[in-house]
From Swiss-Prot:
This is Uncharacterized protein YpiP. It comes from Bacillus subtilis (strain 168). One of its GO terms (molecular function) is rRNA (guanine-N2-)-methyltransferase activity. CDD domains: AdoMet_MTases. It holds the Pfam family SAM_MT.
Amino acid sequence: MITTSYRPSEHTIKTAKQLSKELNMPYCGRNKQTVEHLLKSAERDLLVVGKERFELYTKQGAKFFFHPNTAMFRAKRFLQGEKEPMLRAAGLSEGDTFLDCTLGLGSDAIIASMAVGETGSVVGIEKNHLVSVLVRTGLHSWETGIEELQAAMRRIQVKNGDCFEHIKQLPDNSVDVVYFDPMFHEPVETSDGIAPLRDLAEDSVLHEGCINEAVRVARKSVVLKDHWKSPRFEQFGFNVMKRKTALFHYGVIQTSP
């Protein structure tokens, strides 16, 4: 169900009604009702449209909203010239194309967008329709106070759909880097930012066909970010970049000659 913030403007109400049509979800006027009351009457989750952000409340009690999350800290370090592990794993350069197959909150896509710059491109695929709407809206409207970061966020293209189906439609060698960051098999305690996503995560376990298609379309590399104990690195033939103090590693399949 979709509703508005407590004291909505006419624009907020119009936006909420438009979203209800786009998402095929019922619209309910707020009428000063509490989120808790509305959530009880909602068939599934509750999307609250506000002036500055959208909030999603789940039946399981989780609250999800877009925020640049750790990308803010990573962006500052990137601008200071520090080496970013993900960029090093991917081998990203200015002008490259980056396909993020598991967009989530978009933190990695944001850093990739900063690295590839205006001459490159970043596309993020998110299977959950509601999450894709929230993240797309956030990327295009959030004010960060950091010009380079904000511009990078605005450049990201968000697409809703299944990443395997999307990759299958792409020509050979059509992107530079294909990136996967599936929901961890084991929760990582320091990844609090993704905790609300667990209730919303689509069950799209990586499989061999998906990796094979990624290798086909990637000019430079296919990168997998996963828990350090994950069997998927070995299962799919990734060379692991081990980091002594990190709870997750990056695996790389080089596709360039």
